[in-house]
Amino acid sequence: MPYLYRIAYDGTLFYGFTGHPRSLEPHLRRALGDVLGRGSRTDPGVSAVGNVVMTSAKVQPAAANSKLPRGVWVWAAAEVPEGFNPRRARSRHYLYVAPHWGEDLDSMREAAELLAGTHDYASFVQRRGEPASTVTTIFSITVETRGDLVFLHFVGRGFRNKMIRKLAWAILAAGRGVLRKRDIADLLERPKPGAVPSAPAEGLVLLDIDYGVEFQVDYPSLRKAYRYFLWRYRYAAAHAAVFKAAGEALAAWEE
């Protein structure tokens, strides 16, 4: 019987999820056995708190975590029926966070509304391997600003290679006036592969994959992952405050 495991990881510590000696999957194989499937093949630099892997072995999360390196945790498990495909999820929820340089919020929201729905997203995909359909459905894209940051939430059934990072770039570009509504409509109606750059990977995190499956949470493992990300956040916030103070000190010389 196959088993699903929810995993959280700091993507800045690994060279992607799979396909490289320094990727995450070799570590997961040592801890959980052969990986039969995965929820998302995240790029180098992309983090996750709700990615999923499937194996044939039943392993307690604490036992798996004892074999995993710093920055990755198994924190929940579920038994699933034979033939279960972790690529076929009800929905996937990603968050992209970017610095706010004064991008117009209304323009970004208009772009997000255009990009949501069912479309051919070939302009927003970087192909790898064999050709696959670039038609998919995005249920919602929400845009909000908080202080110096822009938060972009993407919820959809499935996303292709680099797709969210390219969509994020386009939405931010709309906020800067670089892309107009008709430019975005044109990219959807007349696909131009390679026309849209990718936003930096470090701004992206996979928050959840919904299968309608009830997972058993290992709370000690969950808390360890939480404490790690909180620790990373506080140190990053302190470093950001140093740079802000330095900039303000230099700006004062112009007064």
Swiss-Prot record:
Entry-linked SUPFAM superfamilies: Pseudouridine synthase
Keyword tRNA processing part of the UniProt annotation: yes
Active site: D43
Reactions that this protein is recorded to catalyse: uridine(38/39/40) in tRNA = pseudouridine(38/39/40) in tRNA
Record: residues binding substrate: Y94
Annotated PANTHER family: PSEUDOURIDYLATE SYNTHASE, TRNA PSEUDOURIDINE SYNTHASE-LIKE 1
Protein task: Formation of pseudouridine at positions 38, 39 and 40 in the anticodon stem and loop of transfer RNAs.
Identification of the protein by name: tRNA pseudouridine synthase A
Source organism per UniProt: Pyrobaculum neutrophilum (strain DSM 2338 / JCM 9278 / NBRC 100436 / V24Sta) (Thermoproteus neutrophilus)
